[in-house]
Design a protein with these regions (language model features):
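Nucleic-acid endo/exonuclease domains
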Residues: 1-127
Length: 127
């Protein structure tokens, strides 16, 4: 069992706002491609503090939307503590390893990325 048994509560609501504006933009971009698939948002991974921003169960594709705090220390997001930033980097690495181990393609989208089909094809992911 990879995900919590109550995974249904994480089923995506395509119209509901997301944690961030960019995450909502990604959701709206993938909707025409994934609208008929089984898709979850903020899906928790069993036995960890990890969650996946989006997970398509039909295609075994996860999407992580990475804000600037995933690329550099940010006093606000990391509570003015560099150890918190290092912990975040470790969690990001754990997500990558989790996905690799379980045959899940992971697409990481950063704030500055142009959300497009070309972006997904760089990860060899075809929507």
């Amino acid at each position: 069992v990879l995900f919590r048994s109550n995974a249904r509560k994480y089923a995506i609501n395509w119209d509901k706002k997301s944690k961030s504006d960019i995450q909502f933009r990604v959701k709206q971009f993938i909707r025409p491609y994934w609208g008929r698939d089984i898709v979850f948002e903020e899906l928790r991974v069993v036995g960890t503090r990890l969650s996946l921003d989006f997970y398509n169960a039909n295609k075994k594709i996860a999407i992580e939307v990475q804000g600037k705090q995933h690329q550099q220390f940010n006093k606000f997001f990391h509570n003015n503590n560099r150890a918190n930033w290092l912990d975040q980097l470790k969690r990001d690495d754990l997500k990558l390893k989790f996905c690799l181990t379980n045959g899940i393609k992971l697409v990481e989208i950063y704030e500055d990325d142009e959300i497009s089909i070309d972006l997904f094809s760089k990860f060899e992911v075809y929507l």
